[in-house]
């Protein structure tokens, strides 16, 4: 039988904020600027991110300090298909040496590690149940829009921290296996395509 665990709202275990406003990106500053990478929803390609592609931008030092991301931060899109992605390493290690900033179309979830495991929260937010809850709260017809408040109020079960970590580890392993199988399938497709092209004499 499934176990019963207390439910909490996301805002009880994490700080939830919007991404950087568009008006603050590439804003001139007399105090100099810091080069950063701005993450948009297209970069959120899995629950556990080991590499991040972002757009180049320059931010005043105070703005960069206020908006730059940290290891353990979770990003979700503010529109489109809802999903959640965890920064598993320091941002500079994910981006080739740049600080990272969540773009205007993202929300940032910074989990209090003393209350919950960030990897577990990222997994919970990626489940079909959480996605359905966010879809139900969305505004907009052609494109679903997710508010920061709706994200902050989403509720989910919170088991003991040790179990949170075990569940997150299992989810991480499953994602790694899926990626490995996908890469194998791509390689097999490339080999097959090459072989068939040789049969046709259709070679570069």
Model-identified regions with their sequence ranges:
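Short hydrophobic-aromatic micro-motifs
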Residues: 37-40, 69, 74-77
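Short, charged/polar surface micro-motifs in flexible loops or helix N-caps
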Residues: 44-47, 60-61, 74, 80-83, ...
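A short glycine-rich beta-alpha junction/loop motif
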Residues: 99-105, 139-165
